[in-house]
Amino acid sequence: MTVDSGMPAATAGRRPASEPAETGDGRDAVVCHCRNVSVDFDSSEGRRRVLEAIDMDLHEGELVSIMGRSGTGKTTLLRVLCGLVEPGPGSVVTVRGQPLAGPPEGAVFVFQNYAASLLPWRTVERNVALGLEGKVSQEEIRERAAGALEAVGLAERAKDYPWRLSGGMQQRVQLARGLAMDACLLLMDEPFGALDAMTKTSLQDELQRVHREREPTVAFVTHDIDEAVYLSDRILVLSGSPATISDEITVDLPRPRDQLATKELPEFLQLRRRVYDAIVSDR
């Protein structure tokens, strides 16, 4: 997926709910399509609406960050996309054109709590292979697990157990599991939020490389504005109660991006300020 660095650095535009999704013929196909999505939860005070009138499309090979204040429903929206939370009446959610009815084929959720998502009694390669078991042959499982570990730089740690790996390496195992399943949709919930600064930047660049080489569609929840601008093609900002998408910001920075050079660009700083203003305006 290429980005035209000659375009303006900070542009925005919501696709109207009535506008047809793009479907090939030189345009990016829509992997995930949401219209009028709402979510209600039970609380001590009765039913409470968390999300309302969410309209969004995730396009083939796109990396989209979802931001907003704590409690605005960012994780809830990801869980809707992977079929773990049922949206309210009138909601339309499709993945690859198919209405969502449970976890969709080809979608993988990457959690912030990497330690809890890996099985400590399984080796790294067997953790990566977990989602493939019973679906493909043993030979294909081995090939796909090996290829995924190679892609995230962990081929030499295939026989290790997760508890022997650093936090950053464990998070790479989660990413490899998604790659092994040939995921068309990676749903990442603050995957680097619990890591130290150096490991975090390293994994940001690892994700950028994997995204460039394999082109999965990625929806990425983060509270880190710099991270969102650095990684994303677009940033969606949730605000309000119940939350809606209050802003959509296109990130037209050249790729591949560099932790120092990119973040020194005037365009990066303009985007950073714009995202900050969009979030803090939700009072």
Predicted stretch roles:
Residues 180-184:
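A short, proline-enriched helix->beta-strand linker immediately N-terminal to the Walker B motif
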Residues 82:
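Helix-to-loop junction immediately C-terminal to a conserved catalytic motif
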Residues 161-165, 169:
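Conserved ABC ATPase signature
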Residues 136-157, 209:
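Conserved ABC ATPase "signature" region
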Residues 67-69:
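The feature captures the beta-strand-to-loop junction immediately N-terminal to the Walker
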